[in-house]
């Protein structure tokens, strides 16, 4: 750590009303503010595309200097904790702020771009908007993560000298450099690709997807070309195959793209199978490891339409193999199934948002920024939640078990009592440490095991009694259970 807690608090207190843009793109975004704080404190920068992924994209880096805490019912944040909001904020990008104070019901924090006014003037680099760092009061959400840095009591002269170098390096690394990017619509010429739901792969991608991705990337300052020119009249697969057949590894298809110095290549397709097959994924050469762009595009697919599988290495596709042969930064993305009605209904309705998010994945930051208070466009329905042994789905599709017993709080801060089985539900009171209640049912949802009971008021109430994993297995407990 390069500053003490007192120094960090002074910087934080003085940040109110100011603006921060360390990467010099799209004005004053929420991620910029958290990144500036992290750079000043540690000399390193947070990396990644979306705010909600900060704890996961930067896990090893953060844990060198502090800890990542997933919010739980009786957790109390501290001043200077970095709070990471889930993906339903910021149009799917999430949001991040820094805590000023907290109680068990709400917390107060400082942040940029909560109202989407951190970038308004239309200039990508560096961009400008009137919204400054402002104070907000928030309820807790689920999932919500807090990053707590371990500040020292004092910093040595040597560490101070290192801080100047590390902060300068971090700021330099934060700047996003323009790239030369080639976007390739799959199929072409006399090959329409897959057909389904009133359209074909070749025409749909050329009309709705590649031009919009190009629009947003150009807005971000990148040099972008569409394969085959503005009409996208060529098929890169057929062109590459011709180059292979005639032994010309310079003038056709992906060889031509390489010879013209493109830094990044994205080829876009729609998948096809039975009507029930759903979701997208990214394909790369088995000779490469997935890079940040591959993972970020995969995240866009997963968090919006849904994924059928993760980033997939292959060695049986022509352009994939040629990309390894000539060492070019290439991936093929299947954005969803043209043969699945739900997939195509979602893509047709949200093609501009989808394109913008994919462009942001390539750019390395959400393009144009997003209003934190807006909930993202709804994804299509997902599969039923996992049902642990002994539970059944109730009428609301929530795993429930008829169970009676006693629960005794074993947490000095007590357990929040709510009017529903979600950390978004209203807190109606706090069950103090060592208090015991008789319960008559249990739920497993939203990352917690909940119990329910009738309070003295005659109203049904709910308590989160511990965390569970994705399969519903208990991994922590806030109290003790006993049978009746």
Curated annotation (Swiss-Prot):
CDD domains xrefs: MurNAc-LAA
Annotated EC: 3.5.1.28
Entry-linked InterPro entries: CHAP_dom, MurNAc-LAA_cat, N-acetylmuramoyl_amidase_3, Papain-like_cys_pep_sf, SH3-like_bac-type
Protein name stated in the entry: Probable autolysin PH
Catalytic activity: Hydrolyzes the link between N-acetylmuramoyl residues and L-amino acid residues in certain cell-wall glycopeptides
Record bears the keyword Hydrolase: yes
First-level EC class: hydrolase
Keyword match GTP-binding: no
Lineage of origin: Bacteria, Bacillati, Bacillota, Bacilli, Bacillales
General function of this protein: Has weak lytic activity toward S.aureus cells. Full-length protein has no activity, but fusion of the Peptidase C51 domain to the lysostaphin SH3 cell wall binding domain yields an active chimeric enzyme, suggesting that PH may be functional.
Keywords: Antimicrobial, Bacteriolytic enzyme, Cell wall biogenesis/degradation, Hydrolase
